[in-house]
Amino acid sequence: NATDRAVSPGFINMLSWGVETLIEDGKSQSDIRQGVTLEVFGEGMSWGPLNHELRENILKNQGDIKYDINWTTLGEYLQFLEEKGISTNVASFIGATTLRINAVGYENKKPNDSELEIMKNLVHQGMKEGAMGIGSSLIYAPAFYSSTEELVEICKIAAQYDGMYISHMRSEGNRLLESVDELLTIANDAGIRAEIYHLKQSGKNNWNKLDRVIQKIDSARAEGLKITTDMYTYIAGATGLDASMPPWVQEGGLDKWIERLKNPKI
């Protein structure tokens, strides 16, 4: 009896980091009790495809939740969750960071032709397994080493399967407008639908930019590009301390980064 109650379809968590917590506890009570019935993974990192280095790094850096990794591809990971038994539905983008680490590692370098081909083939594989498209998080290492051209090339493959490109853009602050332009360029050049993760303008100096962001998106949509955004339902944000560190400090992966942090000048 739903008299005097509001009835709604299940909510979609477009940016879920339940990739590990669902392994530990598939009941997902924290989201289920808020009405979330679909968890979408893949903001930059996805739990597949995994090469040996990625698998070892995930195992090495596990926190309180410990688990074995008996999968390689993204499809195998999602199948693992399904067979384990979880309350929510799940879906995932292919992490652009995950693709880059598979082919290039953690270095600040442009992928050569063979490395780019590896990334493209992994996109083909992931999309055939049911991935939603490509997800990027360009404010974090090693994602911020990716060029616009690199992202266009891998998005072209996802577009062949009617996938989407979704991005935590390079900047949500002083270079917000330029970052929106980059996303629109990727969408146009790759012929792909695109969405901006958690659209915001960080820093008081940038609060006046939202109208121009909306104008850019409206203009792109009027020209035929399929662009959408999502937003928080609150006026706060949080991230890790790594987001405030320059790219050269983080180059080469976590071990080299930690070694550099021992330098008092840093």
Pin down the residues of each PLM region.
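Short, basic, glycine/proline-bearing loop/turn elements
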Residues: 8-16, 198-203
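Conserved beta-strand termini and adjacent loop/short-helix elements that scaffold enzyme active sites
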Residues: 2-3, 93, 197-199
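Divalent metal-coordination and catalytic microenvironments
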Residues: 4, 15, 35, 90, ...
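Divalent-metal coordination cores built from histidine and acidic residues
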Residues: 24-132, 225-227
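Acidic, glycine-rich active-site loops and adjacent beta-strand->loop/helix elements
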Residues: 17-20, 44-47, 171-173, 200-202
